[in-house]
Amino acid sequence: MPKNKKRNAPHRGGGGGGGSGAATSAATTGGPHRTVQPFSDEDASIETMSHCSGYSDPSSFAEDGPEVLDEEGTQEDLEYKLKGLIDLTLDKSAKTRQAALEGVKNALSSKVLYEFVLERRMTLTDSIERCLKKGKSDGQRAAAALASVLCIQLGPGLESEEILKTLGPILKKIICDGTASIQARQTCATCFGVCCFIATDDITELYSTLECLEGIFTKSYLKEKDTNVPCSTPNTVLHISSLLAWTLLLTICPISEVKKKLELHFHKLPSLLSCDDVNMRIAAGESLALLFELARGMESDFFYEDMDSLTQMLRALATDGNKHRAKVDKRKQRSVFRDVLRAVEERDFPTETVKFGPERMYIDSWVKKHTYDTFKEALGSGMQYHLQTNEFLRNVFELGPPVMLDAATLKTMKIPRFERHLYNSAAFKARTKARSKCRDKRADVGEFF
């Protein structure tokens, strides 16, 4: 087609191709139709996620984060929009239901709305249950993601227990269903771990969940019996999510159960370090570091028989220069396994600092890091806001009651933009110098040959 024809051609994105579902959702939310964005800021902030979801019109009002919501609308406006989205979760159109679920999830990730969610938890649970049972892959993923955020909003208690009792058997069925979508099973495994971590009050149910997740990720062990069979398969992403969810639940198990799991998996997990999937290697390495931390917490003189071979394998991964692997994967792997090696050999953990508002949280253990990473994946960019105001998360990380500051106090604490720019520039230079000492420059140069 000639260029002038292309220029004058009508735009196809807005008119008749949107469908009735999108028009209904735009009218319900009370805002103009917006262009669908394939990725959100939340997805961009999570480097280790294996999938990203597209957002339709019902969720577009929450894309700008809590600050924009505070400026553009009151609490009543937000709740009004959420009511419309909750109604759309029961729409006949599958795409509209999916977009509505994602919109509710985005809103609940950005704000703490305990009373609002408490009143409508049954409706939300019914919508999630229906999408998990009858929906396809994308719908099931959206429903499972919303279930995680719903439990985070409510925290531990009877309400979350009821949600887990309703959705738990369905999640378990999808996870173990070999005919279901891998992406849906992966999201359901993460959701099952998060919901069980928050809501379970029955030790038998906790052990049953652990066994369910074990039955998934231990299938990667079988690949190591034959060295000619590659460890990485289409199911690897599911195995990774199951392993990480299993590790999260292990942190709340009684000591007797932890000892049993350590005896069963301590000598099998290292086999996953030779997997050709970098995310599996990293997940296995971080899980091993956490298991060592738990074991040494129970027994200060804990002794691991194959320590020499394990440290040799970890050191090789921390200095990996394999030309057949992507440069980005190698850098990420080397960074993680330097910390894992220090944890196994020296019982050391590099303390991290998380800033949210006027507060700071220090992550000084593998258990705390893994817990933080799990909830960060569920909440995305809303994690900082929830750390400030969500009582459940503040109890998990031992932050105490929420700090209540008025607008005038916050304004006096705000640093001027120019001073922030100078501080960030100085911090950037210092960070660059510090990290340059840890980089293996010779390995990077060798990759070009």
UniProtKB/Swiss-Prot annotation:
What keywords tag this UniProt record? Cell membrane, Cytoplasm, Developmental protein, Differentiation, Membrane, Neurogenesis, Nucleus
Q: Which domain of life is it from?
A: Eukaryota
Regulation: induction: By nerve growth factor.
Tissue expression: Expressed at high levels in the embryonic brain in the period related to neuroblast proliferation and differentiation.
CC terms in the record's Gene Ontology section: cytoplasm; nucleus; plasma membrane; sarcoplasm
Q: Which Pfam families match?
A: IFRD (PF05004), IFRD_C (PF04836)
Gly residues bias located where? 12-21
Subcellular localization(s) per the UniProt record: Cytoplasm; Cell membrane; Nucleus
Cited InterPro entries: ARM-like, ARM-type_fold, IFRD, Interferon-rel_develop_reg_C, Interferon-rel_develop_reg_N
GO terms for biological process?
glial cell proliferation; muscle cell differentiation; negative regulation of axon extension; negative regulation of collateral sprouting; neuroblast proliferation; positive regulation of DNA-binding transcription factor activity; positive regulation of transcription by RNA polymerase II; skeletal muscle tissue regeneration
Q: Where is the composition biased (Basic residues)?
A: 1-10
Give me the stretches of Low complexity compositional bias.
22-31
Which GO molecular function, any one, fits this protein according to its record?
RNA polymerase II-specific DNA-binding transcription factor binding
Q: What is its main location?
A: cytoplasm
What are the start and end residues of every segment in region (Disordered)? 1-41
Q: Which residues cross the membrane?
A: none
Name the family: Belongs to the IFRD family.
Oligomeric form and interacting partners:
Interacts with PSIP1/LEDGF.
Function per UniProt? Probably participates in neurogenesis. Could play a role in regulating gene activity in the proliferative and/or differentiative pathways induced by NGF.
Q: What is this protein called?
A: Interferon-related developmental regulator 1
Q: Which species is listed as the source? A: Rattus norvegicus
